[in-house]
Structure formats: structure tokens, C-alpha cells
């Protein structure tokens, strides 16, 4: 059975799921980025694995649960025929971790690494099939498997090149 993440909120959850939500985004300065790079290299993990571990740990503490499920999106262009096609090819992956307070941080980090590698191996398995195969009772006010999604956009640059043209992101 998939655990439900009940976070303390200032309002009652509606009976039917809405798409109202919020997004939190941030940008790291160069010094923090370099520290993170050293850390992930030392522990032989990716930035995503680090942030998934952090998010799961924070959610675990806020919800006072030792079993947390978080969703993420993975590019779904595994087949050569999709490389030249326009459009978004993505699949939702589900991560379940147990960041208990008595567990050593590096142990949990390694668990998330193993979980991530396993998820990548099965990334072609459609999310809808997973939901159907688990065949759980479904609460109409929630996503069937998770309430929080982590998306890491690891953009090192603020511009892209298209042939002889250059597109630059301008912050306003």
C-alpha cells in the first residue's frame, strides 16, 4: 500500500483534486554550485539524487512519516525514432524512500541512489500502467501515488544556440 503524505496545511483539502498548486524554484550561486559538485562527486551520486534525498527528508520531517513517496519526470526519448520528432516525450517516475530519523544521512543517500538507478532501468513502464497494476482504492482528492513532484532542471547556461542564432534568457 502506498503511503499518503499528510502535510500540515492552513486549509482543508477539497474533496475533488484540483490542479491548484505552487512551484518553488531557485537558482544556486556559483560557490554553492561548486560545493554541491564536490559533494556529489565524493558520494558518487547525481545532483538529482542529492535533491531527491533532501526533499524526501524534509517531507518526512514535516509530515512526521518515515515512508515518503515523491514523483518525478524523466525524458522518454529512448527510441531512436523519437530523436527528430517535435513534442514532449516524458514519463512520470515514482520514488519511495524511508528517511527515518535514526538512519544515517549517507545511508539514506545511497538508498536513493539505488532507487534512482532502478527507476531509470524501468523508465519505459508507463505511469498509468503502474497505477492500474497497483489497483489501490483511489481518493479523488489526490494523485493516485504521490502529492509532491520533484523536477530538476539542471541548466548550466542562460542561452541556447540554434544554427547561427542564439537565444538568451533575460530575467525581468
Predicted ranges, named:
Residues 8-14, 21-172:
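Adenylate-forming
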